[in-house]
From Swiss-Prot:
PANTHER family: DOLICHYLDIPHOSPHATASE 1, PALMITOYL-PROTEIN THIOESTERASE/DOLICHYLDIPHOSPHATASE 1. GO terms for biological process: lipid biosynthetic process; protein N-linked glycosylation. CDD domains: PAP2_dolichyldiphosphatase. It is found in: Endoplasmic reticulum membrane. Required for efficient N-glycosylation. Necessary for maintaining optimal levels of dolichol-linked oligosaccharides. Hydrolyzes dolichyl pyrophosphate at a very high rate and dolichyl monophosphate at a much lower rate. Does not act on phosphatidate. This is Dolichyldiphosphatase 1. Pfam families: PAP2.
Amino acid sequence: MAADGQCSLPASWRPVTLTHVEYPAGDLSGHLLAYLSLSPVFVIVGFVTLIIFKRELHTISFLGGLALNEGVNWLIKNVIQEPRPCGGPHTAVGTKYGMPSSHSQFMWFFSVYSFLFLYLRMHQTNNARFLDLLWRHVLSLGLLAAAFLVSYSRVYLLYHTWSQVLYGGIAGGLMAVAWFIFTQEVLTPLFPRIAAWPISEFFLIRDTSLIPNVLWFEYTVTRAEARNRQRKLGTKLQ
């Protein structure tokens, strides 16, 4: 709790711009789009959670690609130095430059890379069930729709122009393709060696690149281990 004397001290206050999104008062669509505009933050939180609990090399590589993509966006913005639309009506933004949109570039990188992963990386077996294929198609469409809606939200909320989100999407898509190829051709062959490092073993870092369907593999292994332990427990109780 602040002391009484501290309340009168002059100070320059700054917001945390990472999660600060403004929308027109009373605009329901703008309110919803403002929350949707926070999707990159939700994605990052999801990645950190996955890495903490799964510790899988490909997930770490994916997050590294997103970080590199953000670095490229920052570099392009500071080289082009194109201002945001309408004279910058928002006071709390990370940078005054808007070309290209970092939100658009982030979401299109995430969506395009996930799309390639679903159809090229996971499509290693020819006996995929109908529901698996349907889930893959629905998820891909959902990812692409999310990328478009986030891009649209940045224009609607006057953070960017259409050209800024368009070029951001193009940059993110190209970066996703390049990083996917780099991961598949350069990093993936190194994953078994990296997973065998002492530091990787200490932190339980694992490589699942040779397993076509990790979800099904984890389900079957967990079920088999649970049944095995249940049988052993039943034997001890007899």
